Regions:
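Short amphipathic alpha-helical elements of helix-turn-helix/winged-helix folds
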Residues: 268, 457-465
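Short acidic, hydrophobic short linear motifs in intrinsically disordered regions
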Residues: 465-478
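Aromatic-glycine hotspot motif
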Residues: 211-214, 454-456, 460
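Cytochrome P450
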Residues: 1-433
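Short alpha-helical segments that sit at the start of domains
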Residues: 433-457
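Intrinsic disorder/low-complexity segments enriched in polar/small residues
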Residues: 424, 445-448, 465
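A short beta-loop-beta micro-motif enriched in histidine and acidic residues
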Residues: 38, 455, 475
Length: 479
C-alpha cells in the first residue's frame, strides 16, 4: 500500500484510528522513525528504535506521557539540559502527580512503594478472588445467552481485581464501581486533541487517604495496614497522599490495559471460530493467545516521551524538548523481530517480546495482574460455554463487522462488545474444568440444559450497560 505520511495527521485521522494497520505497516517499511511535519512529533514505529528510547530514561522524560502532540507550557523549552525546567513546570503537564509521568529519582522511590503492594505472594493470594469473581459474573450473564461484555463483565472485573489486591473490603466494592464509572473530561488520546487537566483518579484519593490515616493510628494486620506502613527505600514514611496516588495508579491500569485486553481478546475469540476451537481443545494455550493478542493489538497503542537532552533515534537527530511517540501497536508488527507479523499465531514462540506493557523502568507493574485476569476470564468462558459468537444484530455479519471502537490515537479497545453464547450444562463444565469429580449428564438432559440464544434476543442496551452509562474517565496509566 502506498500512502503519503506527510498528508496524514495520525493524531486526528478517524480512519487511521479505526484501522491503523496500513499506516503502521507502511511506516515500518519506509520510516521506522519519522518526524511528522504538522506538530514536529517524532513517531517511532520500529521495535529496536523504541527499545532504545525505553532504555534511556535519563534522555527521554516521561513527564508528557499522558499528554498530546502539543506542549502547553508558559515557557519556551530552551537549553542543553531540560531536566530541572521540566520539573519546575510539572504542574502544567496532564496527570503530573501520577507514577507514569515521574522520572528518577522520584519515580524510583514511588515505584518501590507500588512493587511492595503487588508482590508475587500477594498476587498468588489474589488468584482465588479472580477465579471466584469470574464465576460469579458468569453465573449472572451466561443464563441470558447474551451480554454486553465490556460493561457487564470486563469493567467490573478489572476494577474489583485491583480492589481485592489492595485489600479493599468487599462492602466498599459497589462504591468503587460507582466512583470509577462516571466520565469526566475528554478521553486521553481523543481525536479532537482536547487535553483534560482533570485527574479522574483524584476521586480515589480521599478514600485511600482516610483508610491510610486510620490504619496508621490503629493497625489491623490486614493488607491496607501493610500498605499504610510501607516506606520509601530510605526508610521514610510517605505522606498518605503519595500512597493513595500509588493505589489509584493500579486502578488506572485496570481501567485501561486490562479492560481493553479483555475486550480485544473476546472479540477475536468470538469472531474467529478456528482460534476459539483451538483454545477449547487446549486451554493451556490461553496464555500464549493473550501474548499474541497483546503483540498484534496492543491496548495502549503508544506512549509519549520528551527529550531532556540532545539525542538521536536511528539516523534522526533530536533537539532537547522534542516530543516523541512510541507506537507499541506498530512495534509488534516489526518483521525484523516477528516473522509474518500480520498473521495471528497462537503458537508464536516470541510473542511475549511485544512492547504492549512497555519496557525498562516504566514496564507496567500491573502486567502480571492483567495477564492473570485475562487467563482466568477466558478459560472460564471457554469451559462454561460451547460456543461464543459476535452479535450480528449489533455488529453486523462476519466480514462486515461494525465495531464500536474507542475514537483514540492512543488506545485500542471497544466501547461496547455484544456477544451471544451457548451455555454448557453445569455438570459438564465443572467436570471439564476439573473443579469437581462430576459424572456427565445423560445426553438428552444435557441437550435440554444447553441453551443458545439468537442475536435477536439481545437488547440494544442491556440493563447493566445502561446502568453503567457514561464511559469511565480514562486515567493516567497510559503505558
Amino acid at each position: 500500500m502506498q500512502l503519503d505520511p506527510a498528508e496524514i495527521d495520525y493524531f486526528t485521522d478517524a480512519v487511521v484510528a479505526a484501522d491503523p494497520v496500513p499506516y503502521f505497516d507502511y511506516m515500518l517499511a519506509h520510516h521506522p522513525v519519522w518526524r511528522e511535519p504538522k506538530y514536529g512529533v517524532v513517531i517511532v514505529t520500529g521495535y529496536h528504535e523504541a527499545l532504545e528510547v525505553y532504555r534511556h530514561p535519563e534522555v527521554y522524560s516521561s513527564i508528557n506521557r499522558t499528554g498530546g502532540p502539543v506542549l502547553d507550557l508558559p515557557v519556551e523549552l530552551a537549553g542543553d539540559d531540560l531536566t530541572d525546567i521540566l520539573e519546575q513546570y510539572r504542574a502544567y503537564f496532564p496527570s503530573n502527580d501520577q507514577l507514569v509521568t515521574f522520572d528518577p529519582p522520584m519515580h524510583t522511590d514511588h515505584r518501590a512503594l507500588l512493587m511492595g503492594l503487588i508482590t508475587p505472594k500477594r498476587l498468588k493470594e489474589n488468584e482465588e478472588f479472580l477465579k471466584r469473581t469470574a464465576d460469579r459474573f458468569l453465573d449472572e450473564l451466561l443464563p441470558k445467552g447474551q451480554c454486553e461484555f465490556i460493561w457487564e463483565y470486563a469493567k467490573r472485573y478489572a476494577i474489583l481485581a485491583v480492589a481485592d489486591l489492595l485489600g479493599v473490603p468487599e462492602e466498599d466494592h459497589p462504591m468503587l464501581l460507582a466512583l470509577l464509572a462516571a466520565e469526566r473530561g475528554p478521553m486521553l488520546g481523543n481525536l479532537q486533541l482536547q487535553v483534560s487537566h482533570h485527574n479522574s483518579l483524584e476521586r480515589l484519593y480521599d478514600y485511600f487517604i482516610d483508610k491510610i490515616e486510620r490504619r496508621r493510628k490503629n493497625p489491623a494486620g490486614d493488607i491496607l495496614t501493610g500498605m499504610s506502613l510501607a516506606t520509601f527505600p530510605d526508610g521514610t514514611l510517605p505522606d498518605p497522599v503519595h500512597v493513595a496516588r500509588i493505589a489509584a495508579n493500579l486502578f488506572a491500569a485496570g481501567n485501561e490495559t486490562t479492560l481493553q485486553l479483555l475486550g480485544i481478546s473476546l472479540a477475536r475469540i468470538a469472531d474467529d471460530q478456528a482460534v476459539q476451537d483451538q483454545l477449547r481443545q487446549d486451554t493451556a494455550l490461553v496464555p500464549r493467545f493473550i501474548e499474541e493478542t497483546l503483540r498484534i493489538e496492543a491496548p495502549i497503542r503508544g506512549s509519549f516521551r520528551l527529550t531532556k537532552v540532545r539525542a538521536s533515534i536511528g539516523e534522526l537527530d533530536l533537539a532537547p524538548g522534542t516530543v516523541v511517540l512510541l507506537l507499541h501497536g506498530a512495534a509488534g508488527r516489526d518483521a525484523r523481530v516477528f516473522a509474518h507479523p500480520g498473521e495471528f499465531d497462537v503458537q508464536r514462540a516470541n510473542a511475549r517480546h511485544h512492547l504492549a506493557f512497555g519496557r525498562g523502568i516504566h514496564t507496567c507493574p500491573g502486567a502480571p495482574l492483567a495477564r492473570a485476569e485475562a487467563v482466568y476470564s477466558i478459560r472460564r468462558l471457554l469451559e462454561r460455554t460451547e460456543r461464543i459468537e459476535i452479535s450480528a444484530e449489533h455488529h453486523g455479519p462476519a466480514g462486515q463487522r461494525r465495531w464500536d471502537l474507542m475514537p483514540s490515537y492512543k488506545f485500542r479497545g471497544h466501547n461496547h462488545l455484544y456477544l451471544t453464547c451457548t451455555e454448557r450444562a453445569a455438570g459438564l463444565w465443572r467436570a471439564r474444568a476439573g473443579r469437581a469429580v462430576t459424572r456427565f449428564l445423560p445426553r438428552q438432559r444435557s441437550r435440554r440444559r444447553s441453551r443458545t440464544w439468537p442475536a435477536a434476543a439481545c437488547s440494544t442496551s442491556s440493563p447493566k450497560a445502561a446502568a453503567w452509562s457514561g464511559r469511565s474517565a480514562t486515567s493516567a496509566a497510559g503505558r
